[in-house]
Amino acid sequence: MIIGHGIDLQEISAVEKAYKRQPRFAQKVLTQKEFDIFEAYKGKRQISYLAGRWSAKEAFAKAMGTGIGNLSFQDIEVLSDEKGKPFINRSPFTGKAWISISHSGDFVQSSVILEEEK
């Protein structure tokens, strides 16, 4: 049974500005595994990755019904499988979490559906 659905739309350039103002922004948003991947990217791909993880975590918090204020960005880890499909590797939710991250131009959109396991 679906118990939550969260959607987030994020302007990539806004995340880039935040990162340029405060480079530790990436370490606040990303887990260590995510940060290692982030550091392997360069330029626009690096910022796009950071914005995607930010958006995904915001969408997850909305699906939980709590907003990010009651969660830490470190509580949620979003990785990708060998084909590039994102998945939630770690979170406080014990059921199944479905995630989609889409980039287009200066925007990234994420959708998270939380499903209670029977």
From Swiss-Prot:
The protein's role, per its UniProt record: Transfers the 4'-phosphopantetheine moiety from coenzyme A to a Ser of acyl-carrier-protein.
Pfam family of the protein (one): ACPS
As recorded in UniProt, its EC number(s) are 2.7.8.7
Primary enzyme class: transferase
Q: Which reaction does it catalyse?
A: apo-[ACP] + CoA = holo-[ACP] + adenosine 3',5'-bisphosphate + H(+)
Residues reported in the UniProt entry to bind Mg(2+): D8, E58
State whether keyword Metal-binding applies: yes
Localization: Cytoplasm
UniProt GO MF annotations:
holo-[acyl-carrier-protein] synthase activity; magnesium ion binding
Q: Which organism is it from?
A: Streptococcus uberis (strain ATCC BAA-854 / 0140J)
Name of the featured protein: Holo-[acyl-carrier-protein] synthase
Family indicated by similarity: Belongs to the P-Pant transferase superfamily. AcpS family.
Name any cofactors this protein relies on.
Mg(2+)
Biological process terms from the Gene Ontology for this record are: fatty acid biosynthetic process
What's in the GO CC field? cytoplasm
Output the InterPro entries linked to this UniProt entry: 4-PPantetheinyl_Trfase_dom, 4-PPantetheinyl_Trfase_dom_sf, ACPS, Ppantetheine-prot_Trfase_dom
Keyword set for this entry? Cytoplasm, Fatty acid biosynthesis, Fatty acid metabolism, Lipid biosynthesis, Lipid metabolism, Magnesium, Metal-binding, Transferase
